[in-house]
């Protein structure tokens, strides 16, 4: 690595910008259909609310705003996600530059995020709220480290923005600023930064950002937390010791799943020279160690006293995203030479930057050879186009939010309701005809689903209409494989 490049790391951000633009292009080329989180964003962008359910509303608010400016489209979805990811990597790189002297290690730390499967693959595949958590964590972490090293009014404000956004992204984000606070208080050299009057600005900014949602949360706490708690505590009828064992083992597996590949890659590219780093440290490595320790203790307490039995790897994003930076800080503290390792590392990154988009596209396109179909293979748009030739729907009732979001993408001017989300119930009086659409399971009944029939009776006083079937070829179909949808038309009473 030349001395010029060591002084100038802007090439990292140019490389990342090109990579995320490539990801936008790949997503648009893969399929017009939407996956679960994408469809949720499109469906819920029909209205603006202080809260929507088990997930806090940050991403919904952001996507709603963008759709208001650009219209509903897959391009708007993909650009928002990849722009958030790019900004997150940018802030991560700026944070690394604050506390690492070796610019090669700054590059390795920043691009090292691409070695974490949950960050590089899962976030692109479908996740939205986890992307918002990473974005918020990157803002907070930059503001936090800058407040410790180069304190200013702006740095404390940035930290407050990160906390506010993070709590609006996922509730478990609260563990990150708590861990950071405890970790900094444990170091006498950093303690004055915590007892700084400017910390009041951090708290006030965070509170202002989350205040609208807090008022909603006060009246909807059960609605907002029930689903998450159900996922976390799904241990069946296991005894307390068995539940704790399940929780601890799931946490261990989640940590290995999250960090294993990154640790393996660093071990390979640095080889034996990595060994001295294991026993080396600095003020910054000690800070990050305490943060990660507090975070993990917090989760263990949730397992032991909160009944959590299933910890998912993506829930570790608010804390373990600092892993590449932590390893690089250890390497620098040991005085390890980085020139050869950097060249090897860039080969790995090149493989990842080419391989991940190819894998994302291939997981859908390979269906023409394997006959294994993903949600993105489903032909929602051709189905709706055919049904609109029969009649132009004035409103649509979908069997679930996945279907509702996919339908709304192609008919944004028409209200689309979902049986599984009663929170959105616009006035349908005078809107006719009403189109009902549902997914047909393979070899399942073709009749109108009971919950849709009940919805019609309760909301419209309408009897069960004739159920019909339409099938369309899968995207990237093998042979004559087709996907079936059930549908029905209802002429509503005036």
Residue ranges and their predicted role:
Residues 47-48, 286, 306-344:
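Hydrophobic/aromatic-rich transmembrane helices and adjacent perimembrane loops
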Residues 177-283, 295:
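Transmembrane-lumen/periplasm boundary regions of multi-pass, lipid-linked membrane glycan transferases
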Residues 124-132:
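Short acidic/glycine- and proline-prone juxtamembrane loop motifs at membrane-interface regions
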Residues 47, 155-171, 182, 205-208:
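Membrane-interface alpha helices of multi-pass inner-membrane proteins
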Residues 109-118, 163, 167:
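Short helix- or helix-capping micro-motifs
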Residues 140-158, 331:
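Membrane-interface transmembrane helices that cradle and orient dolichyl/undecaprenyl
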Residues 79-101, 115, 120, 139-143:
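Transmembrane-helix motifs of polytopic, lipid-linked glycan transferases
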Residues 306-313, 335-391, 401-415, 440-446, ...:
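Membrane-proximal, lumen/periplasm-facing interface regions of secretory-pathway glyco-
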């Amino acid at each position: 690595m030349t001395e010029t490049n060591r002084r100038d790391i802007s090439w990292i951000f140019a490389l990342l910008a090109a990579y995320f633009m490539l990801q936008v292009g790949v997503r648009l080329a893969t399929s017009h259909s939407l996956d679960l989180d994408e469809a949720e964003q499109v469906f819920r962008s029909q209205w603006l609310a202080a809260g929507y359910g088990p997930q806090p509303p940050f991403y919904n608010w952001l996507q709603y705003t963008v759709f208001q400016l650009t219209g509903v489209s897959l391009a708007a979805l993909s650009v928002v996600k990849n722009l958030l990811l790019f900004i997150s990597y940018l802030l991560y790189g700026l944070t690394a530059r604050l506390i690492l002297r070796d610019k090669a290690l700054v590059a390795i730390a920043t691009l090292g995020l691409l070695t974490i499967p949950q960050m590089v693959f899962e976030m692109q595949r479908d996740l939205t709220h986890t992307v918002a958590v990473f974005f918020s964590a990157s803002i907070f972490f930059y503001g936090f480290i800058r407040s410790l090293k180069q304190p200013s009014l702006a740095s404390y404000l940035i930290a407050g923005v990160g906390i506010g956004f993070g709590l609006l992204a996922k509730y478990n984000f609260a563990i990150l600023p708590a861990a950071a606070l405890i970790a900094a208080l444990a170091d006498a050299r950093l303690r004055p930064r915590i007892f700084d009057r400017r910390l009041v600005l951090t708290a006030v900014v965070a509170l202002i950002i989350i205040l609208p949602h807090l008022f909603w949360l006060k009246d909807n706490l059960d609605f907002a937390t029930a689903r998450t708690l159900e996922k976390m505590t799904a241990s069946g009828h296991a005894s307390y010791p068995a539940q704790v064992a399940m929780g601890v083992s799931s946490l261990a597996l989640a940590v290995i799943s999250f960090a294993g590949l990154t640790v393996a890659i660093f071990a390979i590219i640095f080889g034996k020279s990595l060994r001295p780093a294991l026993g080396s440290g600095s003020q910054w490595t000690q800070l990050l160690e305490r943060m990660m320790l507090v975070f993990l203790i917090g989760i263990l307490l949730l397992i032991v006293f909160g009944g959590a039995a299933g910890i998912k790897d993506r829930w570790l994003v608010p804390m373990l995203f600092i892993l590449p930076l932590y390893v690089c800080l250890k390497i620098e503290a040991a005085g390890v030479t980085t020139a050869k390792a950097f060249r090897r590392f860039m080969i790995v990154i090149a493989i990842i930057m080419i391989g991940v988009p190819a894998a994302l596209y291939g997981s859908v396109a390979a269906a023409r050879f394997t006959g294994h179909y993903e949600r993105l293979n489903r032909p929602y748009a051709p189905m709706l186009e055919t049904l609109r030739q029969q009649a132009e729907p004035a409103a649509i009732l979908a069997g679930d939010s996945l279907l509702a979001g996919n339908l709304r993408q192609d008919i944004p001017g028409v209200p689309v309701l979902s049986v599984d989300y009663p929170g959105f119930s616009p006035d349908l009086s005078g809107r006719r005809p009403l189109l009902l659409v549902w997914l047909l399971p393979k070899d399942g009944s073709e009749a109108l689903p009971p919950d849709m029939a009940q919805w019609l009776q309760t909301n419209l006083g309408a009897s069960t209409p004739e159920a019909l079937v339409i099938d369309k070829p899968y995207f990237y179909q093998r042979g004559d494989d087709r996907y079936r949808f059930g549908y029905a038309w209802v002429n509503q009473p005036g």
